[in-house]
């Protein structure tokens, strides 16, 4: 859903209601959990060290659960920020500003996009989730947001993706879509590291 201004609460609510009824926009759901990539998709990976120690591990988990990696790149509009990323089956709504200034009633090109939380990882040394795109998203595919703690106590954030442009114009602009995804991965990592404060 493309808009020239940030969406109203009513627009977000209607969009969410439609999205909750939709299945993911591709067949290979859950493949990112094992690092697999369908033949039609391009894969990506971005891994950074968050810090070390038990306190860092707990803060990083809280930041991931709270969606802190989305700050300043995409927003979780209005009341949708309360949608838990730690609930399998949850529909996650993101507001992407493609260009134009941030803020209410500001011009620009915005899009609402939805993803479904497909799986959770909650193990002693691994924590995270994976979500997949729903119809109307600019791409089709998955992202896995995973924290890992190694034997020395270091905490790592590992983002893996597989995707392909989904809409006619985004297929035409696949190189730009790929560049935006790589930029997004770096941004997600930077925001998560900042939020964890290790």
Swiss-Prot record:
Disulfide bonds: none annotated. InterPro entries: DUF1990 (IPR018960), UCP010260 (IPR014457). Signal peptide: none annotated. It comes from the Bacteria. Belongs to the UPF0548 family. PANTHER family: UPF0548 PROTEIN (PTHR34202:SF1). This is UPF0548 protein DR_2035.
């Amino acid at each position: 859903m493309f808009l020239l201004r940030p969406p109203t609460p009513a627009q977000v609510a209607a969009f969410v209601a439609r999205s909750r009824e939709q299945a993911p926009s591709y067949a290979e759901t859950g493949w990112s959990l094992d690092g697999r990539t369908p033949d039609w998709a391009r894969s990506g990976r971005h891994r950074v060290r968050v810090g070390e120690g038990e306190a860092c591990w707990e803060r990083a988990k809280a930041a991931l659960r709270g969606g802190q990696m989305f700050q300043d790149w995409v927003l979780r509009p209005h009341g949708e920020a309360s949608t838990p990323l730690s609930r399998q089956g949850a529909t996650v709504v993101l507001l992407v500003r493609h260009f134009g200034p941030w803020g209410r009633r500001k011009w620009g090109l915005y899009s609402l996009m939805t993803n479904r939380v497909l799986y959770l990882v909650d193990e002693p040394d691994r924590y995270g989730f994976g979500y997949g795109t729903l119809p109307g998203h600019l791409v089709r595919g998955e992202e896995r947001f995973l924290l890992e703690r190694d034997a020395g106590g270091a905490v790592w954030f590992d983002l893996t993706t597989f995707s392909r442009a989904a809409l006619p114009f985004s297929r035409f602009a696949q190189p730009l879509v790929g560049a935006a995804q790589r930029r997004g991965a770096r941004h997600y990592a930077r925001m998560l590291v900042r939020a964890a404060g290790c």
